[in-house]
Amino acid sequence: MSDPRPETELHLAAPDDTARLGRWLAACLRPGDTVLLQGPIGSGKSHLARSVIQSRLGRPEEVPSPTFTLVQTYGEGADEIWHADLYRLTHPDEVIELGLDDAFGRAICLIEWPERLGRAAPASALRLSFSQDGEGRRVVLTGSADWAGRLSRIGGFAHA
């Protein structure tokens, strides 16, 4: 029996490739989607989130890393995006204090350091795992069965 969780692996040779992946991902996202961005400091998580946010907003909005604010929100209604950096959280219950539990399911949520979510991580989330790959980055995209159709179109990114 095959694994129902689709997985795609990409090599991102340069920061421009990370930004391009962010633009591709922005076009695939829908309200209620959560993207978990996992990887070491400096691996491209914030860069990708910035590209997703700017692409969804349709303008070059300043998108600082939410390392100290923990959460930044952009847009409203169907265009609402939550960008969270959970590095400084010490307990999964703090997610509730941030309001993320309310945002899951209605807004697009981009979550850095998702391991801090514990069991609060949405089962339907798309996980992007970043790692160093020579001079570039390797990113593995893993999603629930809901992501299978969208991830099958990743070839459009890989060959663009």
Please provide the spans of the model-predicted regions:
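Hydrophobic anchor at the beta1->P-loop junction of P-loop NTPases
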Residues: 35-37
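Short beta-strand-centered segment that lines the nucleotide-binding/catalytic pocket of NTP-utilizing
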Residues: 59-74
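Phosphate-binding P-loop
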Residues: 26-32
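Short phosphate-coordinating micro-motif centered on Lys-Gly-acidic
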Residues: 2-3, 8, 92-96, 101-160
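P-loop (Walker A) phosphate-binding loop of NTP-binding proteins
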Residues: 40
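Conserved lysine of the Walker
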Residues: 45
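N-terminal pre-Walker A segment at the start of P-loop NTPase domains
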Residues: 2-22
